[in-house]
Amino acid sequence: MEGVLVVLLSLVLVVLSVLILAVARLVRATRVDKVPDPAPVVPRTPAARGVGDVTGPADFDEEPTVRVLPAPWEGSGAPATTDADSPADRDGTAARTGDSAVTAGRSDGGLRAAHGGSAEEAAQIVARAEREAAERLARAERDAAEIRRRGEEDVALLRERMLAEAAVETSRVQAAARESVRAEQEAARTEIAATRAAFDGEQQAWRTELQSREVAIAAREQRVEDRMASLDDHGRRLADRDRDLLDRENDLTRRTAEVADLERARHAALEQVAGLTAGQARGELIAVIEQEARREAALTVREIEARAEEEGEERARRIVTTAIQRVASDQTTESVVTVLHLPGDEMKGRIIGREGRNIRAFESVTGVNVLIDDTPEAVLLSCFDPVRREVGRITLAALVSDGRIHPHRIEEEYARAQLEVAERCVRAGEDALLETGISEMHPELVNLLGQLRYRTSYGQNVLAHLIESAHLAGIMAAELRMPLPLAKRAALLHDLGKALTHEIEGSHALIGADVARRYGEDEQVVHAIEAHHNEVAPRSICAVLTQAADQISGGRPGARRDSLESYVKRLERIEQIAGDRPGVDKVFAMQAGREVRVMVVPEEIDDLAAHLLARDVARQIEEELTYPGQIRVTVVRETRAVGTAR
């Protein structure tokens, strides 16, 4: 605050200095403006100049001059000069007016005398004019001194007024500063008081808490002391009881010995009477009783087992019959051929293309055989893999609808068809969840579940089989008073591994269980998946229900065909044998397994390696598989050079 006061005082002093300088300049300017302007002069006549050289006043440094007075006809009442701006002139206006008139008369007379030719009179006139000029000059100096004095008084008054205002302003600033300092001090005191009060409150709280803790500790110590006293008393009572028990034990030991002696004497007497020892008599009695008990127990167990078996079979038959009656499933057997209808027979030629270029490109890209026969307005698509067959069907349908069929267009539509089939798989999985009433499943599991829409097991659609199994398991779980969601979930996911058998080696049950465990399924569901083919012993009712639902869905009449499943497995193994080789890009089993087309990467497989690859694949197929006829292995190595014209 002291620094602020010093700065404010310095500013006030600077302002006062500036005001004083401005007033001084104003006074000097006023003094210059108030000096009378010199009257116009004319040169003296030769006669007057001669006289003036002798009688001129010694106070003037310049050459004496004679004022030109107005002519008689111009009026003698006007003064020669006026200075209305000076306050002294305003005060003596009348006197100066009279003097001017006299001077004018004298000047007029002087002029007339000069015109008359009297030199002496002219000299007198000049002398009077000079005296008058000296008087006017003295009067002007007195007026100037008076003006200077008044100006100095005004400056002094102004300085005093400014100093007083500065003192008042300084006092006000000091008072404001003191008030600000006082307010800050008061705020600091208030803050210190609040801090001190808070600190005192915290100290009081700590004291209260310490006191309460001390009271609690004292109470606990008192309880401990009471407990110790109670334990001591209890220990004394236990010691007394131990002594009493020891005495009783000694007494019982003595009595037991006496009873044993009496018992031995009695047994000896009985043995003498019966002719048998005690051990022999006991053995005979136990043998008789044991034989009777075993016979009765065997009869009871046989009766219970027969009754339980009859009731169990009856109840199981009723549960399974009820489940089958309540589930009405469609025929789920599927073939490996898809029929695509054409708008006209001329479209067959466009599908074949020039020299079969289009149909070869289609089969190479999709891995689906196109069978064109005499059937009007229809072509057949044949492939053991339902996913690949569906992708080929969508691709060919799009090409036929568009009308532009060439190898580049086939590749574009094939990529678009793959995306569409992937979306259909997701929708199929979601529809399966909605149909079975299951919610909150991991998206990857839903995707794998939807892929089973295009998988078959012995000719039966796997997704339809899973949905049917889920319904059967739910019905049987309801009959057994079990949780329905858990049984349905296990039955719906038990064949999940079939969606990955082409990618991962192993049993589909173990693969599905591992995938379900990885995506957070319940351990009971995982166990039911891995145990539905008895690869793991079932340990829960949910696993047994899953097995039952699987057998019911797959064992009903018309559900499966074993020959189709073995055929599909043989084709999958053929593709796997070729696909495991390094440098292989794609593998397609064509012509119902009689031809295998292997697409290789041209940068990794040259022409010589392609021949060796075809021979090795053919030899491995001969060693591992059993098949009718012959299988031709074709290795395709294609190099493309693409240029863009702009």
Curated annotation (Swiss-Prot):
Q: Which residues cross the membrane?
A: 4-24
Name of the top EC class for this enzyme: hydrolase
Q: Domain KH, which positions? A: 336-402
What is the first-listed, main subcellular location in coarse terms?
A: membrane
Stretches for region Disordered: 43-62, 69-118
* One Pfam family this sequence matches: RNase_Y_N
Domain HD span(s) in chain numbering: 462-555
EC number(s) per entry: 3.1.-.-
Q: Which family does it belong to?
A: Belongs to the RNase Y family.
| Biological function | Endoribonuclease that initiates mRNA decay.
Q: What is this protein called?
A: Ribonuclease Y
Q: Gene encoding this polypeptide? A: rny
